[in-house]
Amino acid sequence: GTGVPRPRFALVYNGELYNDAELRAELAARGVRFRTACDTETVLHALAHWGTQALARFRGMYALAFHDTLLNTLLLARDPLGIKPLYFHVDERQLVFASEPHVVAGHPEVPCRPNLAMAAAYLTTIRTVLGNDTLYEGVRTLRPGQMALCEFGGAHPVVALQNAPRGRWGAQAGRGAEISA
């Protein structure tokens, strides 16, 4: 080995955090040292510090994957308004994710078959929201404000879908009425 320690946390993030300065200041006051001025680093430190409860503090649009190498877990999350999409496939060997369903379906290890039931539902009802299923069999999506907690310690990945913690939306947390997405 090179003697360089492997970082505990890794983040794949697509989005924009509107309250970056506020969260960055709070984390810095708690001893977090920042190396960049990028909101991606704020998201990484917030998730490392607060876990999934950090999602309730985020104001912005995002889709993310946060890996904890010590616990061998992966958090997938999507913003409450669903501005940034997130698709995934999981089987006994792997988890594949991307911001577009055809990218997941086109992965060489993902069987690409049409989801005929979803195609029929889409064509007969003109629905644009299909829950977690997509037009590709085995490719799922996170609904707005949803997260997937993935554990990789056993014989195959275990994925639990649930609603992400929600905070208050508005100019500042704690002011005004709470708005549900």
Each PLM stretch: what is its role?
Residues 1-181:
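Cysteine-centered catalytic environments shared across enzyme families
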